[in-house]
Amino acid sequence: MRTPYDFDPGCTRRASVFTWLAMASVVTTVNLAYAGENFTVSSADFSDGGKIGSRQIFNDAGCKGPNQSPSLTWRNAPATTRSFAITIFDRDAPARGWWHWAVANIPASVKSLPENASASGALRKLGAIEARNDFNIDGYGGPCPPPGNPHRYVITVYALNVDTLPLAQGRPAALFDREISGSTLGSAQITVTYGR
C-alpha cells in the first residue's frame, strides 16, 4: 500500500526529522524525570555503613546506653509526599528479625528529627505516633544484640501518599510496617552496625 510519502521524497525526510524530534522529546522527558537528586536520609550520630552512635544503645538486657533515638535528616522526598514514617529493624536477629522503632504520621513539612525525639516528646508535639517495639515498649528501643557477631540495623524513612495511617499509638511495629508498605511513594535507607 502506498502512502503520501511515496510521492514526495522530501516528505520522507521531513517525517524522519519529526520522528527524531519526537524521540528526542521523549528522551529529554525521561532524563528530566531522573535529573533530580535521590531521596536520602542521614544522621549526625553515625554514617551509612558505620557503627551506631553510643547514645543510641539500649539501656537494659545487659546493655548500658542512654537509649536515645537518633537524629535524622532527609532530603528530596517525592513531591507528592503527604507524610513520613520511620522504622529501625535488626535484620540479623534470629527468626523474623527485631523491630526497634516504628513511627508514623510525621507531617510532610518535617525534614528532620532531633536526637531523642522519641523520649523527649518531640514526636508527640508533631502529632506522630509510635509503635510498640519488640522490647515490648512504646517508642524507640536501641540496639542490644546478644554477644557475638555485630548486627545490621536498617533505618528507613518512608514518604507516604496519605496524611495519616489508620494506626494507634502502641500497636505492634509489624502492623505499622504493613500499613506503611501499602502507602509508600518512596524510601531512603542507611544501615549501621552494633555488636557486643
Show the residue positions of the predicted features.
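N-terminus-centered regions that define maturation/targeting leaders and the start
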Residues: A33-R196
